[in-house]
Amino acid sequence: MKCLRWRSNRHRIYLLVACGALFLLNRHLTQEESRIDEEDEELTQVDVNEDDKKIECEPPGSIESKCIADNGKSMKCWKDEEDVYFPVSYLKKRFDMTGKLGKDGSTFELYTSYAKMRSPDSTYDPLGPFGHFSTYSVETRDRVRCVSAKTDVPMSTQWDPIPYYYPIQISQYGLQHYSRMKLDSISNKSEASPKDDVILGVNSKEWKGAAGMHETTERLFFNDEQMGKVVNISAGAALANAGAYVYLDKSPDLHVISFDWKPYEANSSFTVLAKMKQDDLLVLINYVYSEGNGKCVWQEEERISDDYIVQKPKKDGQVSYSYSYIGNSPIGEWSTVTRDLLVDVARALSSGDNRKKDDNVVLHAGDLRLVSLGFRGELTVKQKITQRREQHSHAFYAAADWLVKNQNDRGGWSVPVERSIAERKLVLPPGWHSAMAQGHGISVLTRAFKHFNDEKYLKSAAKALKLFKINSSDGGVRGEFFGNIWYEEYPTTPGSFVLNGFLYSLIGLYDLSQLELMIDENDETMRAKIQEAQELYSAGVRSLKQLLPLYDTGSGTIYDLRHVALGTAPNLARWDYHAVHVYLLKWIAGIEKDEVLSKTADRWIGYAYGKRAKHN
């Protein structure tokens, strides 16, 4: 039995790990895990200092006893002549601790926080990698239903079972891939490197046709003035038809495919066949012009009768799923397709109707290999199919482009589903805006402006400022707390005053304010917008300095200030949110060169390692 030794006379907690049969009770201790909400960080298990990692065990020499804590129920404990030993299961719950037993079974590691406290490695760069977002994996979060084949950005089911576009999630997806792209360029790695890419389909002999008279496939090869070497395909549109196909490279690292095609009819489709390494399961991923009953990915159905349709079971070691491709490109026009099959297969396998939260499938490079790429219907394909390791530039472009195309007249990206807070004491109807979404969106767009050298991104970023000047009660994101302005992640009435969303909005405003040197000196309109961003940022920082102490509990931080208006208990921040507060506060402190903010962040780091504010 894992126990913790309580030395009241020394005010310290020591660990006692028992041996023998009691060791089998190890299953009672599980490491606390908490997936962070998609608007914040994904953090790894904390590393404690080397001096604190190992706590030597002493011989038990104790007898079983009965203990009562805070007038609660009695529990089994142990005592010897000097000390009393409490079960970790009790201490974990009572003191919000966590821990784990080492692999060798002789060492127990105790944590106050399950989240690692990070500080920025360098001064914040408005055009550089976005913090440690490069370690994110937005597309594998359990609330992400798919990366849409229509728009190439993630769709969420966090607050509604029907997939929808959540602006914060989309921006984080873009910032994740931008950060990876920048770090790859720093380390002289390029996703476009010829040595990493494999080009297929150039040779006409690589294009195979379906066998059997009932599956005839016509392939006509010619040179197109615009696209060069192409193949015109005419094949049966049924998904059961193999169509015209090309065998793909077997390397498990090359899980991203890219090609150009022009479909002529709505029944045109393409399919990637992948093989799982673990069980040799064959997975068919079809991309079709179908709405899918509101789903972005679904398992193919089998018609038993006119009134009875069921999902196709796993048959002969093979399953089939489809992604909705409607809206990606008009029929009869050329478009470029780029898909990461590692993501698409994982999202498909996680998409069953009876899926539970813990059924989320996450695949890693090496877990599958691509077998073939096939086409059906009437279409033309360029004879250049590219396989590569990553798609960072494309994913970043997709996110930035989505922001430009989906920005409304007020400069915002609205959330199309209801959001309820505090047991529905605060409710935001569909169509609400978020200051965090505005800030994240600006951070994506300013980087896209520099990376792609396209002013449409700069104009969109400038347009996003409008909602920062509109009150929450009027559909904007501007709130007020004791005379201090606040940019609301959730613009409820009364306000909720979420800390992390406010800090992210400040970073977005700062990003735009730093583009002055990149703007034409004769562009007075845009220069005025840059100045406006600076003023909004400065006003927010002034409020931060005034209100920040309200978020400090002396042992952790508070997520928001909803309790002030609602008269409820404070909403304490989980340790992963606490880690976000620390990181963002360090960013702002570095930008402002503010010693008070920096020391506050340092104090908050101490809370994660068991330090507490002094008593009176």
Swiss-Prot record:
Any one Pfam family match given in the protein's UniProt record, by short name: Glce_b_sandwich
Cell compartment(s), UniProt: Cell membrane; Secreted, Extracellular space, Extracellular matrix, Basement membrane
UniProt catalytic activity: [heparosan-N-sulfate](n) = [heparan-N-sulfate](n)
Known EC number: 5.1.3.17
UniProt entry keywords in alphabetical sequence: Basement membrane, Cell membrane, Extracellular matrix, Glycoprotein, Isomerase, Membrane, Secreted, Signal-anchor, Transmembrane, Transmembrane helix
Top-level taxonomic group: Eukaryota
Pathway(s) it belongs to: Glycan metabolism; heparan sulfate biosynthesis; Glycan metabolism; heparin biosynthesis
Sequence similarity: Belongs to the D-glucuronyl C5-epimerase family.
Protein name per UniProt: D-glucuronyl C5-epimerase
